[in-house]
Amino acid sequence: MGDFSTHRVRETLLSRKPREWSLEITALFLSMIMGISLLAWRNGAALLPTLAATSEGVLKQGEYWRLLTAIAVHGDVMHVLSNAILLTFFTYLLFGYFGFWVFPVMSLAMAGLTNYISLLTYPSEVSLIGASGLVYWMAGFWLSMYLLVERSVGPRKRVLRVVCLALLVLLPSTFQANVSYRTHAIGLGLGVVSALVYFQRNRESIRAAEVVELEEPFDDPDEILPP
């Protein structure tokens, strides 16, 4: 039987260091979220109803800016801190590896769409606040892109890493009546869909960033890995 050779992806887009200014952009965004939340707490009676996403304001009055301002408003310190941890992680990764058009442009646009779809499913008296929809969109996008892009890691190991991270950061330890898990699910689903579309539109440039090396020839064709 003849010798067979194959190739292995040694590096991908995600093997490189995040782009410059990733830390600064992350710190700036987190500062904005924390600052607006603090203002809302100090002036809750006047400011909180103005910034929250409500059916009356968004669906009836056309105040679509509420879909974005609601992201920066949180109910209490624990609410904002729990979101801030994941926002720091995913903001750094999305801006660092995919740039300005993924974060903040696509991220905030899809977070607004997440809030809009969520409002459509709730009674008119429900209002939405918090960055959880954004966090879950970012998680869905990043985890999906990792599966699609990081071919320097074997498929099984990639899936295992994604499942473990998803269970660790996305699965709630307790269930609370005032938390919109529906918004979480919508954000996560939109994140996955956004990643699939983004990957297809940018597949050529993403694959061009790969560094491929040839493996030593061997005899068993069943061990050949697909390109």
Question: Across the structure, where does each feature detected by a protein language model lie?
Answer:
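A detector for small-residue-rich transmembrane helices and their helix-helix packing motifs
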Residues: 2-227
